[in-house]
C-alpha cells in the first residue's frame, strides 16, 4: 500500500466553453482559474438562468464538434486546481521532495507480504517433492535446491547479544527478552493503526500552508518504518516456523511409513505361510505364532493412532483451506471424498490391509489440504463445502490474516509431528520381529546388515534369558538347549562374516566379471600388455580349471569351423556316472548355492576363453607379419600396394612396440 499517494500533483482540468445558441441572448460562459479558486472552496460562476437555458437544449442543438469526446478541439487544458502561491512552494521544494522520495524507497524496501508467492511455492514444493504423495518405497531425489529460502531467516536476522540474559532489549522488531535459550519478542507498535494514522496525517499536510513539515514527516516515517519492520519480522517468522514444522513432519511421517511398510510385509509373509503349514498338517511354531500376534497388535495400534491424528489435523486445517484448490488437488491425486466418508464413518471391524488403505487415503487428503493453502481467503459457498461439512461436522470457514493462518498451520504441524514421533519408539522397540521370521536368515539386500545381525542376536539372547528365568533346576536338557542357542547365535555371526568376505570378492551384479575385466564393445582390444597383466589377480581368487580347454579355430570371418560340421556325440559310461554324481551333489544345494556355483563356473570359463583368444590373436598377427616380411625379402610382388604393418592383425604388435619404445626413451 502506497501511503504517500497524496503527494501534490499538477492536475490538468479542461476549460469548458458553452457555444452560443440562436435563442440565447447571453454571451458564452467560460470557467477560468481566477473565478474558480478561493481560499475556502471552489465556486462555479454560472447563474441559475444560464443553467435553466442549458436544460432547454435539445438533441438538434448538439453537433459532431460538441464537447462530448475527450481530446476534441473544444477542450483546452488549463491548470486550475492549485493556486500560484501554493504551486510555487512545491516547485521550490522539488529537491527536498526527491530527498524524501529516496527515504521512502528505503522504507518500502522490505514489505511484510512481498515474498508471499515465493513462500507458497516453496511450501508446495516441500510437499510435492516428498515420497508421501507417490510411492513410499521409491527413491527420493531432490529436484533442485531453493536458493532464496524462507529457512534462511536466521542468517538474515542474526543478533549479536552478549550478557543480555534476563534483560529487555529494545530493537526495531520489538522488545526482546532473553530467558535461557529462548527468545521472547513483543510487538511495540501496532501495524494497521500506525499506517492509517500516518496516511491521514500526510493527507492533511497537503492543505496546510507555510508549515515546517520536516520534523513531522521524519517522525511519521520513523513510525511507519518501525511498524513495517515489526510486521515483516512477525510475518516472516510465522512462515519460517510453518515451513520448518512441515519439513520435520515430512521426515517423521516418512520414517513411520517405511517402518509400517516393513511390518506389513512381514505380517503378510507370516499370514501366507500359516495356511501352507496348516495344509501340511502342522501348525506354526510357538515363536512364529507369538511373532504374528505381536505384529498384529503393533500394526493395529500404530495405524489407528496415526489415522486419528491425521484426521484431527485435517479438520483443524480445513477452515483456512481454499476449497476450490482442494477440489483440484484431490482430483489430481485420485482422492474420492465418498470413499473417504465411508472410511471415516464406518463402524465395521477392519483387517490390517483395510486399515492401511484407510491410512493412506487420509494421508493423501491431509497433504492435499496443505497444498490448498495460499494467500487467498477460503470460499464460504461452494459445492465441496457441503461435502466437507458432512465428513467433518466441525468444519467452518474462518477469515483470518496471513500471520494467523500460518500460525494455525504451524501449530497443527507441530502437534502432528509430536504425535508421529511418539510412535517411532514403539516401532523401533519391536524391530527384532522383522528378523525373527526366518531364524538365522539375514536380509542380504539390507544395507545395514551389521545392525540386523546385532538386533537378531539381542532378540535371541532375550528369549534365552526369558527361558532361563522360568527354570529352577539345572539339568542336562537345559545345558544342551543353552549350548544349541549359543551355537545358533555364533552361527549367525559366522554367516555374516562369510557373507561379507564373499561380497568383497564377488563381482558386481550387473556383469559376470569384475569391473577391471569388463569388456566394452569398442572394437579390437589394443592394450594387450595391460589386459593380460590384470587377469592373474582375478584368477587367483577363484579355483582354476583342472582340465585343458579346447580352443576352437576361428577363421578370418570370425565363424567357428566346427559349427559347419555337426554330428552326434555319444557319452561314455564314465561320463554318465560323473553326471549322475554331479546331479546328486547339486540336488542338495539351495537356489542361492546353485546360482553362486553357476556364476563361478561361467566366470572361470570366460576368463580362460578370453586369455586363449588373446593369445591366438597375438600369434596370428605375428604369423601374418612374418609372412609379409619373408615375401618382401624374397622379392615376391605384393598383392596390394599398401604399406607394411597396416592391417588389422598388426595393430596389437605395433601397440606393444610403441609402448616398448616409449619406455626406452623415458
From Swiss-Prot:
Job description of the protein: Required for peroxisome inheritance.
Subcellular location: Peroxisome membrane
Biological source species: Kluyveromyces lactis (strain ATCC 8585 / CBS 2359 / DSM 70799 / NBRC 1267 / NRRL Y-1140 / WM37)
Name of encoding gene: INP2
Annotated glycan sites: 374, 582, 604
Protein family per UniProt: Belongs to the INP2 family.
Region feature (Disordered): 562-586
One GO term of the biological process aspect: peroxisome inheritance
InterPro entries with a match to the protein in the record: INP2, Myosin-bd
Transmembrane listed as a keyword: yes
Protein name in UniProt: Inheritance of peroxisomes protein 2
GO molecular function, one term: myosin binding
